Amino acid sequence: MSSGKRSLQKRIAYEAAKILTELRTDNLAYACRKAAAKHGVTKQQLMPSRDEIEQALKEQQRLVLGDKQHTALNQLRESALDAMQALKQFQPLLVGPVLQGTADDNSHIELHLQADTPEEVLFALSDLHIPWQEKQRQLNFSDGSHETIPCFRFSADEIQYLLMVFPNAKNRKRPLDPFDHKPFQSANIKQLKALLDEEHSAGSDYYEEAFPLSRETSRG
């Protein structure tokens, strides 16, 4: 890679991180497009990677939010674990900024669930006395297909949750992250517990040192 291209990607990543921090949004794709447009870039090959943007975002958050971000992130991960344990029959996976380590107190918790039908998840939410809003999301999958996925939003203890419900299949095709078109990075209950235990024992602000990310393949 040329030094000029590398420098441009770093500038776009920094600008995207600045947008994400200032707008308090998790929309990585929007921030990247807006940052690229500011630099007159439209070619995909000149865009920074997810890792580059997230690293720049963590640096911005440390400067702007300080300990406030780390405290919010830890609370969100603890709340995510509670929700995953309450919904463990659906083999939940945590995805998104709460897992990546870039969430703040304006972020929501996003979980991927497996169920034979979406109604099974609704019954579980009803049993937990949780009111919800039904949504839909368009996603691409690892086999090249494109599908509409049922989603359910709810709020608990002033934290927003988004549940995405996928078919309960033995060899389920993997949903792709809209930003980089790769399988979502994810953590199951066991992995999230390990992450929290590691963070509590080490007191580390650095997510990548505490827990290696994996693409969405495992549950439990």
Regions found by a protein language model. Give the residues of each.
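Catalytic core of pol beta-like nucleotidyltransferases
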Residues: 2-25, 32-105, 115-220
